[in-house]
Regions:
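Conserved PLP-binding active-site segment of the aspartate aminotransferase-like
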Residues: 152, 230-239, 257-298
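Conserved glycine-rich beta-strand-loop-beta hairpin in the small C-terminal domain of fold type I
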Residues: 1, 197-207, 218-233
């Protein structure tokens, strides 16, 4: 286990240890923008793999891959929210082992599953010699805490530590010791239990509000996990000119924020929509905010 200054540093370490400039990598599409930009900065050839309700689409994996890394968020695919079944995880591990492909497992939102028990990480299912597992405390505690970690196979421990020391040096000890004590005294588990209950209530509230106020405008993707939802715009409205970029811009005038779903795609966006975080929104404000969103979308439609 290597402690890092956030999950993004862990990604950069893995890239520098495993890849050369120009190597091909496989990323979920749509997927995490920060991951994509990290590989672009290393001049990698990026190939997108589509995702569905069960996360990454196994059938879309190349039969004879030339890429060196496959990046996955199996616990809660970002941004679409799909949760990868155990059988799919095992099949991907087998595919990677047979083809000499590294797996970069981003354990995004693993702590916040509301309607089912989390499945074991791919790193813990065997064949660990090709899996680099990345996690972070930023989302479960607070964003300003830049404290992450990576679990790496024995053969890359030394190069990963060397690379980390070269690019960033030591991770601040005060934060490490504070979090370690927080965990050891049982506060971390109590915090997760409390926040899981709170976020579950917010999750149910925002889903209900979207279904009530956004009928025929947008449909919420409901996976029972995480601190955000994805709203998929009605395709007919998009064909008529509704744009998620315009909606996000108009939302700012009402002090509301969201991310346009189209920006998470590598190339042409297959769907328009919004990535809506709810963790820092008061429970009582969720319904009125969704009503405001409805008015914003209707206004954008009349102006197209």
């Amino acid at each position: 286990i290597i402690i890092t200054v956030g999950a993004q540093q862990a990604v950069n370490i893995a890239i520098q240890v495993i890849l050369n400039h120009g190597d091909e990598v496989y990323l979920e599409n749509p997927g995490y923008i920060g991951m994509r930009e990290a590989f672009k900065a290393h001049q990698c050839k990026i190939t997108g793999i589509p995702v569905g309700k069960n996360g990454l689409d196994l059938q879309a994996l190349p039969k004879k891959p030339k890429g060196k890394i496959l990046c996955v968020t199996p616990t809660h695919q970002y941004p679409m929210g799909g949760i990868m079944p155990l059988a799919n995880r095992l099949n991907i591990l087998q595919w990677a082992a047979e083809n000499g492909v590294w797996i970069l497992e981003d354990d995004y939102d693993s702590e916040y599953h509301y309607e089912h028990k989390p499945i074991a990480s791919m790193q813990g299912l065997g064949l660990q010699d090709q899996v680099i597992y990345i996690g972070s405390f930023s989302k479960v505690l607070y964003p300003a805490l830049r404290l992450g970690y990576m679990v790496v196979p024995e053969q890359v421990i030394a190069p990963c530590v060397k690379t980390k020391n070269r690019i960033a040096g030591q991770t601040p000890m005060v934060e490490q010791e504070t979090v370690a004590e927080f965990i050891a005294e049982g506060h971390f588990i109590r915090h997760l239990r409390k926040m899981r209950g709170l976020y579950h209530e917010k999750f149910k509230t925002i889903i209900a509000a979207c279904e009530q106020h956004l009928e025929n405008l947008a449909k919420p993707e409901c996976t029972g996990a995480g601190m955000h939802i994805v709203l998929i715009f009605n395709p007919q409205l998009c064909q008529a000119g509704l744009s998620d970029m315009k909606v996000v811009e108009a939302m700012r005038e009402h002090n509301l924020s969201a991310s346009p779903l189209s920006t998470y795609y590598l190339d042409r966006a297959e769907e328009q929509g919004l990535v809506l975080g709810f963790a820092n929104t008061e429970l009582s404000l969720i319904d009125p905010h969704i009503q405001t969103l409805r008015n914003v979308m209707l206004s954008c439609m009349t102006s197209t």
